[in-house]
């Protein structure tokens, strides 16, 4: 973890490198605030599985997967710093013993039936270059 000043300097250096060398950077972090400031696209992963993908603004303003929604709701609100942070419920399963079906099903509050616990969801195109792997959105694809 970097202090805020060093973090800002490192991010500025990365942006300069991207501009100077016309390249991209894969930035791996849990800090969605930094993602919002620095990235054009975001891939949200859970237990090694891609669960949501799209332009940063679209995913942060309109998160679709319950895990992404939980991450967004866990961010501190600048207009109410006294408010308790919301945690994503449940315990993280072992990556060596992933749950069957959707990898998030043991922590999900939006289970839609047996499919969530038996079948891994496919990515569904929601438009605006935004995809989600969640059985909630299965109807969109059909």
Language-model features, listed with the residues they occupy:
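P-loop NTP-binding/switch modules centered on Walker-like glycine-rich loops
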Residues: 2, 6-84
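Short catalytic/signature loops enriched in Gly
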Residues: 55-142
């Amino acid at each position: 973890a970097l202090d805020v000043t060093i973090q800002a300097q490192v991010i500025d250096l990365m942006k300069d490198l991207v501009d100077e060398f016309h390249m991209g950077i894969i930035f791996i972090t849990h800090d969605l605030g930094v993602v919002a400031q620095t990235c054009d696209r975001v891939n949200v992963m859970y237990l090694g599985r891609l669960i949501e993908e799209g332009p940063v603004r679209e995913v942060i303003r309109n998160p679709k997967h319950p895990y992404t929604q939980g991450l967004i709701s866990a961010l501190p609100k600048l207009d109410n710093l006294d408010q308790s942070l919301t945690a994503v419920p449940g315990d993280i399963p072992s990556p060596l013993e992933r749950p069957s079906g959707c990898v998030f099903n043991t922590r999900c509050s939006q289970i839609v039936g047996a499919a969530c616990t038996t079948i891994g969801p496919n990515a569904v195109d929601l438009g605006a270059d935004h995809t989600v792997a969640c059985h909630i959105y299965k109807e969109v694809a059909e």
